[in-house]
């Protein structure tokens, strides 16, 4: 089956892992995603309905606008994908406009421009909540018109919420399946890792996410979580069935060294015996 790409570039996006994720994702009527990101799993599955959430208000506002005002949004966004906008001076002017803009529609248009023209498709904010990704210097950024229309069509069966992972997971019922793609865990308890939003994701929150998954599966609601394969994640997900995906992603650790890390898929499935928590 042909894979559908997201219209946003996204750090840590799950497009390369779709086959593995779908292989282990349980069946159900509704998919709940507390960390929707660019939405690759949503775009490549066939649930009857979707509950999609993220803590990034710009992202959720964008998705609701694409869902409800598709043609208007595509037309307005296309106007920024021109040779004359592909220069640093214009980029920084539009970035400044984004950071002061109060109009949700214009802000959503600028968000797509910044995503495609900014460095590596990063979505990063400073402590004041200002988008601060530098200019990317790409030859000709791609305007994702087909991807926008596909997203909008698929989104007619989705509800988008800007809220915490705990709040969105609380929306799951017996007809739901939950897929969690939290910010990647650090390599160790002392390692630093990138925060893509001003609210960084702590070790306490990583462990709390696993506890919520355990509670949901005890109520017969399956949960699949993806993360780095480390000693920490194996401790957090010790009550799940663990599947290792040989991605061998190279990431920075303390001291500037690079370390190869696989991906871990932790499946909490009702009716599957798991060891007692240590």
From Swiss-Prot:
It catalyses: a 2'-deoxyadenosine in DNA + S-adenosyl-L-methionine = an N(6)-methyl-2'-deoxyadenosine in DNA + S-adenosyl-L-homocysteine + H(+). PROSITE patterns: N6_MTASE. The keyword Glycoprotein does not apply. GO terms for molecular function: S-adenosyl-L-methionine binding; sequence-specific DNA binding; site-specific DNA-methyltransferase (adenine-specific) activity. The keyword S-adenosyl-L-methionine applies. Signal peptide: none annotated. It comes from the Bacteria. S-adenosyl-L-methionine binds at residues 10, 14, 54, 181. GO terms for biological process: DNA replication; DNA restriction-modification system; methylation; mismatch repair. InterPro entries: Ade_MeTrfase_dom_2 (IPR023095), DNA_methylase_N6_adenine_CS (IPR002052), M_m6A_EcoRV (IPR012263), MeTrfase_D12 (IPR012327), SAM-dependent_MTases_sf (IPR029063). Keywords: DNA replication, DNA-binding, Methyltransferase, S-adenosyl-L-methionine, Transferase. Its EC number is 2.1.1.72. Belongs to the N(4)/N(6)-methyltransferase family. May be involved in methyl-directed DNA mismatch repair, initiation of chromosome replication and gene expression. This is DNA adenine methylase. It comes from Salmonella typhimurium (strain LT2 / SGSC1412 / ATCC 700720).
